[in-house]
Amino acid sequence: MKKIAWSLGILVTIGALCAIVWPSWYPSRPLVTTPSQADIQADQSSPRDLLEYFLSGLGETSLPVIQQQVQRYEQENQGLLIDSSLFAQYVQYKAALSELTLPQASGGLSTQEWWQLHQSLLDLQARYFSAEQQALFAEENRLRELAIEKRRIYEQYGQSEEAQRAWQALLLDQPDFIQRSEATAQLLPQLTQAGQGDTQQRYLARVALVGEQGAQRLAELDDSRATFEQQFQDYYQARAAILVRNELSASEQQTQIQQLREQHFAPEQWRRIDALERLKDNGE
């Protein structure tokens, strides 16, 4: 079984369904941002986009700092769109996504397996959000369901006029925003291209979960994580070499290790490095 990493990317917007629950007007106060967000205008048109905006700062800053930013936003805007409680639920939901598993299939996932994945997502949403709050995911869920249904149609009829007629008939029953949505056309090719190896299958699963932009963001995070892991391995080996130098006193060893840490990592990463050192020292 394969685990799907949780997403930090920008997801499919909520659209008209979300407006049923939350007001369509919103405050325009500037938000606290990380350096990489300085030139990004926060999308406050829906709660989902605003949640993703705050979470996108994770990595440059810590979760507690982001939680403080959300609290400040809540206080300044009377809890419109999102509040601390909803943000906490969303973080828990994202963490649960990291534990979601897929069956390993050499030829890619079947339509039934994609449908099971879809149902697993609905179950997770129901676990962490109220019925009203689940409007956060309404458009994304419907688009995913349609993409899987389109896959089923073309599996049944092949690339034929009959398949095209069946698909068009299904689309006609959908709301206008679904029919117009480019996400429908963008999601299906990713779903129907059965995974060619582990990397692509993972990418397809992420597209189903978080959309194209989210999948790309996760791929970037994979690269960043791999870079960090290699950086830590290099650091840990150099640290080990310092610790076996008997001519150095314990104080001198710690001084050199601290200098080594400063060369490899930013100060905000040091607590994480401490934890990783302890785990590795204990053979975990």
Curated annotation (Swiss-Prot):
Keywords: Cell inner membrane, Cell membrane, Chaperone, Lipid degradation, Lipid metabolism, Membrane, Transmembrane, Transmembrane helix. It is a single-pass membrane protein. InterPro entries: Lipase_chaperone. It comes from the Bacteria. The chain crosses the membrane at residues 4-24. GO terms for biological process: lipid catabolic process; protein folding. One of its GO terms (molecular function) is unfolded protein binding. One of its GO terms (cellular component) is plasma membrane. Disulfide bonds: none annotated. It is found in: Cell inner membrane. Pfam families: Lipase_chap. Its main location: membrane. HAMAP family: Lipase_chap. Belongs to the lipase chaperone family. May be involved in the folding of the extracellular lipase during its passage through the periplasm. This is Lipase chaperone. It comes from Vibrio cholerae serotype O1 (strain ATCC 39315 / El Tor Inaba N16961). The lineage of its organism: Bacteria, Pseudomonadati, Pseudomonadota, Gammaproteobacteria, Vibrionales.
